[in-house]
UniProtKB/Swiss-Prot annotation:
Function: Metallothioneins have a high content of cysteine residues that bind various heavy metals.
Induction and repression of expression: By heavy metals.
GO molecular function: metal ion binding
InterPro entries in the cross-refs: Metalthion_15p
Keyword presence, Metal-binding: yes
Family: Belongs to the metallothionein superfamily. Type 15 family.
Protein name listed in UniProt: Metallothionein-like protein 2B
Paired cysteines (S-S): none
Keywords, ordered alphabetically: Metal-binding, Metal-thiolate cluster
Domain of life according to the entry: Eukaryota
Tissue distribution: Highly expressed in stems. Expressed in leaves and rachis.
Species annotation: Oryza sativa subsp. japonica
Length: 80
């Protein structure tokens, strides 16, 4: 996988400008893991939460394409 030579990595030709770090952007962000603990004695009358709502990885980017925004920003990225 190419990280677009330091470009933002948006679009098919990776020409959104430089200084964005390309795919290396995700390496500088701290990786955090959030764990939710449910009370086993919860007496709620609603439907049980089945864990089907998982956050997307890599900055919650859920798309396969990148769109160049202002200042070389990507409004929708999936840079694994």
């Amino acid at each position: 996988m190419s990280c677009c030579g330091g470009n933002c990595g948006c679009g098919s030709s990776c020409q959104c400008g430089n200084g964005c770090g390309g795919c290396k952007y995700s390496e500088v962000e701290p990786t955090t893991t959030t764990t939710f603990l449910a009370d086993a004695t919860n007496k709620g009358s609603g439907a049980a939460s089945g864990g089907s709502e998982m956050g997307a990885e890599n900055g919650s980017c859920g798309c396969n394409t990148c769109k160049c925004g202002t200042s070389c920003g990507c409004s929708c990225c999936n840079c694994n």
